[in-house]
């Protein structure tokens, strides 16, 4: 009878109050723009600035091998992802990059995982028709965990990850007329908030403006062109702080020496 209380006591004792410490991180950045704004090109230039080695860069390409159009930049790797664009297939591609020693992975585009052939929207429609009597709301109970696994794979990867997301014009009805109110990512609502930085690219000028920036590198900055230097600045920010893997290795070494 005391077991539940003992377990609760132990779980409370395991919680520790400690000072916040800045740790080294891997980049999670999104480029959002309509087609033709230069998402892939910008992502490749930034990626090279981060890792400085084309052999350590890969593009998961859902855009009919469009990444190969930029092969003149350097000898980066590609994974050609074709339908179905299910979360599981994206996860498989990300894991292949990790196992291949890639340090910066570009997902171009993440939009297909949500709204492409075999993506989450289509998966949910099929589930609704076949298992939930056309009730799409109930079907999301099964579809959402699939999408969440994709998001968690991105967030937990040991690689730097840059995602490219298509955007479209968002409109509202006002006074009987259609009014443009901005651009909307073709991904699940709140996608950009999962990431460290989200940059919007202008279709005509190809200049970037931040919609979210945890780094503080772009705060108050005028629209700017993405170059390798941008990647170098981001790399410096990512590497500021404690290297957790090195700290763990050092602790294990010290522990071994005590024996």
Tell me the role of every PLM-derived stretch.
Residues 61-63, 108-110, 163-168:
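A short beta-strand-to-loop transition that corresponds to the Sensor-1 phosphate-sensing loop
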Residues 28-30, 56, 104-106, 160-162:
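Residue-level preference for the first positions of well-ordered beta-strands
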């Amino acid at each position: 009878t005391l077991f539940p209380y003992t377990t609760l006591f132990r779980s409370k004792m395991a919680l520790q109050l400690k000072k916040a410490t800045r740790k080294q991180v891997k980049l999670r950045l999104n480029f959002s723009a309509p087609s033709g704004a230069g998402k892939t090109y910008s992502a490749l230039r930034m990626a090279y600035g981060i890792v400085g080695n084309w052999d350590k860069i890969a593009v998961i390409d859902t855009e009919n091998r469009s990444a190969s159009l930029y092969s003149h930049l350097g000898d980066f790797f590609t994974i050609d992802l074709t339908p179905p664009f299910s979360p599981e297939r994206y996860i498989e591609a990300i894991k292949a990059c990790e196992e291949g020693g890639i340090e910066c992975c570009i997902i171009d585009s993440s939009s297909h995982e949500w709204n492409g052939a075999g993506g989450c929207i289509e998966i949910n429609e099929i589930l609704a028709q076949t298992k939930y009597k056309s009730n799409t709301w109930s079907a999301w109970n099964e579809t959402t965990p699939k999408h969440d696994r994709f998001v968690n794979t991105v967030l937990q990867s040991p690689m730097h990850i840059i995602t490219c997301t298509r955007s479209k014009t968002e409109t509202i009805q006002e006074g009987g007329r259609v009014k443009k109110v901005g651009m909307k990512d073709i991904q699940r609502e709140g996608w950009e908030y999962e990431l460290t930085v989200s940059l919007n690219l202008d279709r005509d000028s190809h200049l970037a403006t931040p919609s979210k920036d945890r780094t503080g590198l772009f705060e108050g900055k005028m629209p700017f062109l993405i170059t390798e230097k941008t990647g170098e600045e981001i790399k410096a920010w990512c590497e500021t702080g404690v290297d957790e893997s090195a700290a763990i290795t050092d602790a294990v070494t010290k522990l071994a020496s005590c024996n």
